[in-house]
């Protein structure tokens, strides 16, 4: 679609909206020609009081229009956000004007639907709720603002209210210098068909694992020195991947020992290890986790259908998940998470129902329902694998929510990813008391996350504001291992951020 901007250059927000509203269109900025089938002209002007935007939208012979005005108040930074919002809202209103005019056949061919999340394009649909509650609004006022300001339907707004309220409760438990810790293990037994993460297949890169673990431990120890000297307090720890389960018991023990020796964990009630694929789980590894006081383990089958596991490149069967969960239960960890993905190749609504029912039967108290995200580097896209359509994914999710509620689960966090099937969300469900606070903290951007390991993204949050900065570790295990100076630079930036924006009082 050709985009023409007059009086502004809000490319990013319009491109994000375009991705949601017109999933098959790519943005271009060439001059509009009379024969063009898809184009939109967005014109903005302003007075001292407000920003006024108009949209003219042409799509395969159909035309639509929209207008929107947003007050301009507050700081220059706040006014920039108000301008972006006005442009995005105007584009969305033009789409709403266009949609009912289009024949059903054209909608189907172009994969056009009314977005279930309204005009929200970000990965954190409930963040406006948390922010509104922080400002003193009632839950009903916060939900109504989501519906009127972002055009979110009632059902999705109610879900966002539930998870956003948990985010607000998480915020109240945090103090100014509280942080979370993350350790990444970027290795997997094999690469799944849906995955584009920078992770190494162990069968191809086994020799990298041991030097990686040594470099990781060195980073953890230097990070511990930094955290102690700056009087920061860890509140949650999460080891993810990749698949941490590829580590040997000795390697797991060494990493967790370094964590305990480097950080004061007396105020850290949550220690999570996403051990991952069930075929990597052994009694010896679970014994190590138990000895280090791990409070939550994550077993991630993604599906309990064997033919779906084969289709996505997993080399385990559903029986391996059953065996792994029996082992996990024997060690009596306080909390157990399981992950499922709706929309996998070869899956059906009936198969997804069987998978969810089996996870509930196996005793998880925390179940995350992901929706398949079509990532650019994944085998699904590169090989054109067939996946369930949006209606099938909707049927899967329509079964999940009431089934989990009936089993005593409530939603406690949600987030979106780009290129996600049907513009749905990932939702974390838990029984009361089973929430993973690290997940809430990172999805709601409530506190800084200090990340260790290759590809780690350290997020620095100024409490009580929207000011967030990031530094990134080197992506690949080999370059991470060979270039420790990058770690030193990132830790120096972390210290500088806290000295500048979160000084000790």
Locations of regions flagged by a protein language model:
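Canonical Radical SAM [4Fe-4S] cluster-binding loop centered on the CxxxCxxC motif
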Residues: 178-213
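N-terminal [4Fe-4S]-dependent radical SAM core
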Residues: 99-104, 108-113, 134-181, 230
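Radical SAM enzyme core and accessory elements
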Residues: 1-139, 216, 432-505
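Short beta-strand motif preference
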Residues: 53-55, 183, 299
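Amphipathic, soluble alpha/beta structural segments
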Residues: 232, 237-241, 422-426, 490-505
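A contiguous binding-surface segment within folded domains or other stable secondary-structure elements
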Residues: 398-414
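Conserved non-cysteine loop/helix-boundary elements of the Radical SAM core domain that shape
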Residues: 199-399
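Flexible glycine/acidic-rich beta-alpha junction loops that bind and position SAM and/or redox cofactors
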Residues: 307, 311-312, 342-349, 364-390, ...
């Amino acid at each position: 679609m050709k985009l023409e901007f007059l009086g502004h250059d809000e490319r990013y927000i319009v491109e994000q909206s375009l991705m949601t509203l017109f999933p098959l269109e790519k943005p271009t900025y060439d001059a509009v020609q009379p024969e063009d089938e898809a184009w939109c002209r967005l014109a903005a002007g302003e007075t001292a009081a407000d920003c006024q935007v108009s949209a003219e939208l042409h799509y395969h012979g159909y035309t639509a229009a929209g207008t929107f005005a947003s007050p301009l108040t507050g700081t220059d930074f706040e006014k920039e956000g108000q301008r972006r919002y006005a442009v995005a809202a105007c584009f969305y209103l033009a789409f709403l004007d266009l949609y009912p005019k289009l024949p059903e056949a054209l909608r189907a061919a172009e994969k056009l639907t009314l977005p279930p999340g309204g005009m929200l394009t970000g990965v954190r649909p409930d963040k406006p709720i948390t922010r509104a509650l922080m400002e003193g609004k009632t839950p009903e006022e916060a939900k109504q603002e989501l519906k009127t300001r972002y055009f979110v339907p009632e059902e999705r707004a109610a879900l966002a209210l539930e998870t956003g309220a948990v985010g607000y409760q998480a915020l109240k438990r945090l103090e100014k210098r509280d942080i979370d810790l993350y350790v990444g293990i970027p290795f997997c037994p094999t690469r799944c068909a849906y995955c584009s993460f920078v992770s190494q297949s162990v069968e191809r890169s086994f020799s990298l694992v041991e030097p990686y673990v040594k470099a990781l431990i060195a980073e953890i120890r230097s990070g511990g020195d930094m955290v102690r000297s700056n009087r920061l307090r860890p509140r949650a720890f999460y080891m993810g991947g990749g698949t941490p389960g590829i580590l040997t018991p000795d390697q797991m023990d060494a990493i967790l020992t370094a964590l305990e020796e480097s950080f004061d964990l007396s105020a850290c009630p949550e220690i999570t290890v996403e051990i991952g694929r069930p075929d990597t789980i052994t009694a010896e590894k679970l014994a190590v986790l138990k000895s280090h006081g791990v409070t939550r383990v994550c077993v991630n089958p993604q599906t309990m259908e064997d033919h779906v596991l084969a289709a996505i490149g997993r080399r385990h069967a559903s029986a391996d998940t059953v065996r792994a969960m029996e082992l996990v239960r024997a060690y009596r960890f306080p909390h157990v998470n399981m992950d499922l993905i709706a929309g996998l190749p070869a899956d059906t609504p009936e198969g997804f129902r069987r998978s969810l029912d089996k996870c509930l039967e196996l005793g998880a108290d925390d179940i995350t329902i992901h929706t398949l995200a079509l990532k650019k580097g994944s085998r699904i896209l590169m090989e054109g694998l067939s996946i369930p359509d949006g209606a099938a994914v909707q049927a899967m999710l329509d079964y999940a929510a009431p089934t989990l509620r009936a089993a005593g689960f409530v939603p406690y966090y949600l987030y979106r990813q780009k290129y996600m099937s049907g513009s749905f969300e990932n939702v974390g469900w838990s029984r009361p008391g089973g929430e993973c606070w690290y997940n809430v903290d990172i999805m709601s951007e409530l506190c800084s996350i200090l990340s260790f390991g290759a590809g780690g993204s350290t997020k620095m949050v100024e409490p009580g504001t929207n000011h967030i900065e990031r530094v990134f570790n080197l992506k690949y295990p080999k370059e991470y291992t060979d270039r420790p100076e990058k770690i030193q630079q990132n830790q120096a930036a972390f210290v500088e951020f806290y000295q500048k924006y979160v000084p000790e009082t």
